[in-house]
Each structure stands twice: as structure tokens, then as C-alpha cells.
Amino acid sequence: MQEEKSKEDHSRLINVTAKDLTVRNRRLVEVPYTATLSHAMNTLVANSISALPVAAPPGHWIGAGGSMIMESDKQTGVVRKHYIGILTMLDILAHIAGEDSNLSDLDRKMSSQVSSIIGHCLEGLSLWTLNPNTSVLECMEVFSKGIHRALVPVESSIESNNTIAGVELIESASAYKMLTQMDLLRFLKDHHFDDLKTVLSRSISDLGAVNDSVYAITERTTVSNAINVMKGALLNAVPIVHAPDIAQEDHLQLVNGRHRKVIGTFSATDLKGCRLPELQTWLPLTALEFTEKTSGKEREVVSCGVESTMEEAIEKVVTRGVHRVWVMDQQGLLQGVVSLTDIIRSLRSTLS
């Protein structure tokens, strides 16, 4: 009986496509390769997003990862733009807080062109498209590999008989929408939780969703140091832990967060509401001081227990708009982390 129910769930979900997942999403927000970092940051803030595709004239650039993702005229098919990479908030922050961390030079750094920093963080080189007819299960497969977002053509110019549903590096379309890991989980929460009752009632530990390797910064790590170590470790967010027992130099690097008390979270997206004059004064602060200043109070840490259900984990990431949940034991000490990638990977493996 359970096996039949599983098959029924699978068949319902397989009829959902990437096009369905993006139906309510707005048209693509992007910046030209000549845009300044200041302009790009303002665009990120104005649209409440953490990443932007970067567009350039065709024929002059190699796309991220060798991709050839083009925007073409709907009537003539003439290529107008080539998307050459993704710019993230972490790219901008890492550029500001790099080795040359003379904060008085912030205006000069923010006047740099976005094309000069694409790829400084690895995520900027990850540029993919998903065919609109790709099933939600195939989308989950892609996102379970750590790909955070993909472009979905509104109308593809690639010949339909050559088009295969799935992830692509070559595409031409008159317009695109962005599909993210969060979009997929929000869609499942809003429309398909009933189909997934069995798996959602299982614990995150039972499903193997908890990653027990969790790096952290301490209450004495500055914003500037935090950004640099996050860039090096390809992390968009880290827990801030209480660590009075460690050596002074360890406050400058990532530490093992397990079995420590979490007192905050520092995320690259926390800085997207900062104006440039504020950035200049906030980079030398500790990350903990910064998070308290930006929110006006001590922020609640988004966490769950080791035995929390998958449904509870998804509810937390979607309703709170975060990309990971810290996993605590009964004493409130850090045991691990569950990211959007972990959630999607666990769900996908149960629907095989």
C-alpha cells in the first residue's frame, strides 16, 4: 500500500515542470558587465536578491564554465546579450574586505566594474539553464548537487527537436526567469506537502540531511575577517559561537563549531541593506556587533533539533527566508547544519 502511495506521489510531482515553478517569478533582474559594484549592490538591495546575472555583448567573452547562454530578439533571432556569469553579494563584500583592506579606499573599490570580479568566488562561475519542460524531480536532482540557481527560458530559440529536458550550458531565448533552490522548496510547501507526508514526517537525522561538519566564527571575529574566511571556504553564512577558550589568532579564522553555543548568524546577505558610509564604519566591528546593529536587537537564531522533522526544517527555511538551519542538541549546543542543498538532496533520494 505504501509503495503504491509512493508511486502516486512520484507521478504527481513529475508532471510539475520548471516552467510551473517560475510562473509567478518576475522577469530576470540583471546588470551589464560595465556596471559598477556600487550600481550592482543597489540593484541587489532594491530587488531583495543576493545574486545577479551579468550581461555582455555577444562574441567578446567566454561564459562562466564555458556556457553560451544568450538573449536573442524574439522576432529576428539576432543575439543581443551573452550572460557571462553570476555576481553575488559575497563577491562584492570579498572585494571590499580583501587583503588591501584600506577602508578609506571604499569609493574606489565600489567604482570597479563587475566584470573585474566575476569568478573571485566560485559561485560566480556557476551559470546554468534549465529547459522549461524539465520535471521538478530533475530540477531537484540539479539543485541537490549544490547548484543554487538556474535560468529558465521563457521562450527558447533552440530548436525544439534538439532540446532535452534538463540542465544546459547552451541556450538562446528572448527572455529568462531565475529559478532558485528556495523557489523549489516554497512551491513544494505551498502545493505538494500533502503528497510528501510520509517523507516530511521523518526526522532530518533519519533522512541523512544533517551535515555535522559545521564551521563557525567567534564572538570576536570582525566583519572584515569573517568575509575573507567565508570567501575562502565558499560559505555564504556562518554561525557565531561562544569560544572564550581559544587562542587570539583563532578569532581570525574559521573554527569547528560543533558542541559550542550559537549566539548569532553572520550572512553575506546581512550587508545588502548597508549604505556605503555605513559599510565603512561597520567592517571593523565584530560580526556579532554588526548583526545586532543591523537588526536593532539581538536576532533569534534559526535552529532546529536533531530529531526535528523534515517538514519543520522546510517550514523554517521558507518562512524565515534563510538558506540553512543550525541543528542543536537538547543543551542548545551546535551539532550540525541543514542547508537547502541537504534538504533537496534528501527529498530527491526518497523519490527515486
UniProtKB/Swiss-Prot annotation:
PROSITE patterns: CBS (PS51371)
Entry keyword annotation includes Repeat: yes
Disrupted-gene phenotype: Shorter siliques and reduced seed sets in pv42a and pv42b RNAi double mutant.
Residues of the CBS domain: 24-106, 122-196, 210-281, 297-352
Tissue specificity note: Expressed highly in rosette leaves, cauline leaves, open flowers, developing siliques and dry seeds, but at a low level in stems and floral buds.
InterPro entries documented for this protein: AMPK_gamma/SDS23_families (IPR050511), CBS_dom (IPR000644), CBS_dom_sf (IPR046342)
Keyword Acetylation (UniProt): no
Keywords: CBS domain, Repeat
Listed Gene3D superfamilies: CBS-domain (3.10.580.10)
GO biological process terms, semicolon-separated: developmental process involved in reproduction; embryo sac development; pollen development; pollen tube guidance; stamen development
Transmembrane segments: none
Function: Plays redundant role with PV42b in regulating male gametogenesis and pollen tube guidance.
Family recorded in the similarity comment: Belongs to the 5'-AMP-activated protein kinase gamma subunit family.
Name of the protein described by the UniProt record: SNF1-related protein kinase regulatory subunit gamma-like PV42a
